[in-house]
Amino acid sequence: MVSKQAFLFSLGSLYLSLLFIFLLMDVYARPANNSALKVETKEKATDNKDENEILPPDHLNGVKMEMDGHLNKEFHQEVFLGKELEEFDEDSEPRRNRRKLAAIFAKVDRNEDKQISASEMQRWIMEKTEEHFQEAVNENKLHFRAVDPDGDGHVSWDEYKIKFLASKGFNEKEVAEKLKNNEDLKIDEETQEVLDNLKDRWFQADNPPPDQLLNEEEFLSFLHPEHSRGMLKFMVKEIIRDLDQDGDKKLTLSEFISLPVGTVENQQAQDIDDDWVRDRKKEYEEVIDANHDGIVTMEELEEYMDPMNEYNALNEAKQMIAVADENQDHLLSLEEILKYSEYFTGSKLMDYARNVHEEF
């Protein structure tokens, strides 16, 4: 006969088991999303690539400055190699890359005199910049379809907002329902700040007369401000706003070279800081400050940022030649370009001198 103590112990164990089962049932029976904006599973968020398609990129190929005001470290390679930039990497076979570079040299050397002049380099830079422009146009067609599912050729701010939040892992259907019913959206502070900035940019891209809708061309300007004079001005204002410390809507040298917030105090960080200051000081004094009065205005920065400015392209051509022009004849030979390949391609093609004559 079972003792009273054993019976009570068995009853207690059964109770705990049932309680555990009920708790599990409660968890799995709950809605997958208590609030309309609760983040979905990591797998789903990771698989969602829409964010890269619908967010304006920080980096713009062929533009001298990033959206955050940093100098574009790959600008020289982008305007010299165009779409072939990705083919030149550190792991590529040097002999193959030398041949690629020689083929590019032949294309730039329009008069076939075995030398590249400033005017030839200028023409080439404009062609490569146009190549980047066309690439952005082609990509925009795909990105626009992602935010225009009904295919009516126009996208409202709310439609874009839904897609943006979905790209962040929020439930798209529930967000759409909340917006439709004018219900509050519970969004974290960081995401809301991004949305506010995007909204300002959205309405700037809405060409007059404003209808709060973006067509495909306006959406291109939204993603790529370098394609629109009006959006280029907006981009310049944003950069000056972030760098201008005294609120005069102009940039002094000290404002332009100010170190990024949160600099780490160690030797490696100090070396990075030194590079930052040196590069920005050189660019400010030699290029951006066109009249060399020690002040950069919005107009000067706008001209500097314009990738289709032929005068800028000529200046860039002269600078690129000066870097590798060892004999100071204001022209570039194939040997000089190969020797300074790291500047033009981002890859150092080793043993160029030993191989150049036997290959070319």
Swiss-Prot record:
**Residues that bind Ca(2+) 1:** 109, 111, 113, 115, 120
Pfam families linked? EF-hand_5, EF-hand_7
Sequence positions that bind Ca(2+) 4: 289, 291, 293, 300
Which positions in this protein are listed as binding Ca(2+) 3? 244, 246, 248, 250, 255
The residues the record assigns to binding Ca(2+) 2 are 148, 150, 152, 154, 159
Outline what the protein does: May regulate calcium-dependent activities in the endoplasmic reticulum lumen or post-ER compartment.
What protein name is recorded for this chain?
A: 45 kDa calcium-binding protein
Q: Which organism is it from?
A: Xenopus laevis
Q: Which gene encodes it?
A: sdf4
